Amino acid sequence: MRNTLDNLLNAAGIVISDKQKNLLIQYVDMLNKWNKAYNLTSVRDPQQMLVRHIMDSIVVEPHLHGQRFIDVGTGPGLPGIPLAIVRPDSHFTLLDSLGKRVRFLRQVQHELQLENITPVQSRVEEFPAEPPFDGVISRAFASLHDMISWCNHLPARPAGRFYALKGVLPEDELSSLPQGVSLDQVIRLSVPDLEGERHLVVLKPN
């Protein structure tokens, strides 16, 4: 698995330490092991997890600004845990409403000794942002409209941002953004060995 990860990182032009590579592989091992009992992801093959979960998460890292982030609807920790591994100087709150997912996140935190994550079981609209976050991240969580509606209290103003990971660019969602936000930028992402388009939509709270 290490060779596969090395090849993917090289193809993406991402440089991380051996320790970070080992942590990413440990995380995939744990996800694969827990997935058999808890059904945390539809991806069953660890090699595919490297592409569709690890690489698909960490290609976002250069585009994040700030130090405090919240990953809403994180599921088994995506993209929050891979981002926390490759960005150790930032802190990531990992929010999910399902207990089994949060139990997994806490086990990952313990086994990988990740001091820069905080797993939280809560519905996003009930979670207090005190203080507000530099970035609100979502991946496969909701439409842009719902994300803004549920998470509007979370980002700092005016500097905070919403970061939504999307596949094909959702033109219809972008044309019907709710009041209170505006489009900051759209970044086309390149994920080695992943078919289909990937985009990062960055929204700015007004």
From Swiss-Prot:
Keyword Cell inner membrane: no
Subcellular location as annotated: Cytoplasm
Top-level class of the enzyme under EC nomenclature: transferase
InterPro entries, per the entry: rRNA_ssu_MeTfrase_G, SAM-dependent_MTases_sf
Signal peptide span: none
GO cellular component terms listed in the entry, alphabetical order: cytosol
UniProt keyword list: Cytoplasm, Methyltransferase, rRNA processing, S-adenosyl-L-methionine, Transferase
EC number: 2.1.1.170
Residue pairs linked by disulfide bridges in the UniProt entry: none
Binding site for S-adenosyl-L-methionine: 73, 78, 124-125, 139
GO molecular function annotations of the record: rRNA (guanine-N7-)-methyltransferase activity
Predominant location: cytoplasm
Reaction catalysis annotation: guanosine(527) in 16S rRNA + S-adenosyl-L-methionine = N(7)-methylguanosine(527) in 16S rRNA + S-adenosyl-L-homocysteine
Short name of any one Pfam family annotated for the protein: GidB
SUPFAM superfamilies in the cross-refs: S-adenosyl-L-methionine-dependent methyltransferases
Family: Belongs to the methyltransferase superfamily. RNA methyltransferase RsmG family.
Main function: Specifically methylates the N7 position of guanine in position 527 of 16S rRNA.
HAMAP family noted in UniProt: 16SrRNA_methyltr_G (MF_00074)
Name of the protein in question: Ribosomal RNA small subunit methyltransferase G
Record lineage: Bacteria, Pseudomonadati, Pseudomonadota, Gammaproteobacteria, Enterobacterales
